[in-house]
Amino acid sequence: MGKQVTCRRVYEQTSFEDGKRVLVDRVWPPDISRDDARLDEWLGDVAPSTGLQHWYSHEPFRFAEFRRRYLAELADPEHRSALSRLRHLTDDGKLILLTAAPDADHSHAAVLAERLTGADRSEPDRPAPPPPPGYRAAVSAKVANLNAGAFAFVMGTGIVSTALNINGAHTASLALLVVGLAGCAVLLPAYVWRLLRWRQRFVADLVGPRAFAFLTVSIAANVIAARLVADGDTAVAGAFLAFGAAGWLLLGYGIPLGLIASTRRDASFDQVNGTWFLWAVGSQSVAVAAAGLARLTSSHLLQVLALVCWGIGLMQYLLTATIVLARLLARPVAPGNLMTSSWICMGAAAISVLAGTRLLELPPEGMLLSRSVVAGSAVVLWSFSTWLIPLLLALGVWRHVLRKVPFRYELGWWNLVFPIGMYGVTTHELGRTTGTSWLTTLGRWEIWVGGVVCVVVIAAMVAAAVRPHLMARRAAGSNRRTA
């Protein structure tokens, strides 16, 4: 009887016919508890290196090269103990290798199964690189693995566009606005395509701890609306606000309900992260856009909406901060898991300040709160967001310098652009509204910092997109010379 080794996603339904169930991922998979996983063992040491996983990114057209590199890694002595244990389990009977990868058949678990069953008996010393995929296949793979928070790109470009417009850099501001609108035009159909074509993956993200990242869709629409208000485009801004407010209402209730009602969630704090602050950012983004539009249209309804959303956002910020702080203090934080999303904590406070300054610009007769209450709250929140910046920078030094987590472009970098850009806008507008000149000056300098960060992240994004194609061409040329 031959060896029975198969690979499977850890989220799939378990069966009494399963043999030994072994998780072969380096980190615990999100959205599933240890009881639901029904593991016999967890051998994370046998997983690919972090660098190889980042390079692969579950792109099917890279699988052949990924397989070759991973097999080479498995030959290292550090994997010897874990491989020996897997071989022992294989000899005992049926073995199920579990992974959280979106496609188990094109994951390291499949390569491990091949290695354990002896299927990979021969492989060339220098295999030819896989041919580049067709355009349709490449786009399909990107959409299948689309990050739930992809609209963070639009949030970042939108707020920096607003910031540069304040500083008088109108051409650069318009260029970033166009980039943000183009991002909306590309990403929104991609979300719909993923929902229709890969519904299971989409729903898994929507009911898990990563669900708050979907609020970037609503926030991005409201950020664009606020930017268009500055140009006086009330009709288009109103359309973006309507879409953003509808998304905020749907997701603002749906995501917490999904988390509470889910039967597959982890009971620990492990899955709590900085993206949960997007719950508060969503409410404040509606407040900012609605208040700006109310000032131009004299709409009492929009003024009330802005005030109510501002109050809701403040309470959501306090609730989220409590949960995130409890998670940070109660559970150890791995350097690799301390993502740039931690900066959203500062961004959420900053956008709350901006919403407050926009409320202060509205007619006093429509205010349900004293203007001194709004102004005082804005100053307190600005002070807190300012205090957070050195702490976040120190955490970045701990992550990248002391714990040597490499700098690699990832979508999370846009979670850094948005808070920095928002802080610059907030500081300037708070100074202008309160007549504090030094705040206005500080805000102008912060805006330029946000612009530089945005340019750096765009350059890193383009480099990350181009690098695989350059590597494939270089490898192809090397193989032709060798032949």
Where are these regions (language model features)?
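Generic multipass alpha-helical transmembrane bundles of integral membrane proteins
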Residues: 276-396
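Structural signature of hydrophobic alpha-helical transmembrane segments
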Residues: 174-188, 237-250, 304-319, 378-387, ...
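Helix-coil boundary and interhelical linker segments in multi-pass alpha-helical membrane proteins
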Residues: 162-173, 227-238, 290-305, 358-374, ...
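C-terminal transmembrane-bundle signature of multipass membrane proteins
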Residues: 156, 186-190, 327, 348-365, ...
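Juxtamembrane helix-loop boundaries in multi-pass membrane proteins
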Residues: 132-162, 198-226, 241, 260-289, ...
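N-terminal signal-anchor module of multipass membrane proteins
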Residues: 126-192
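Membrane helical hairpin/interfacial module
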Residues: 169-244
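Residues lining hydrophobic/aromatic ligand-binding pockets adjacent to catalytic sites
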Residues: 1-123
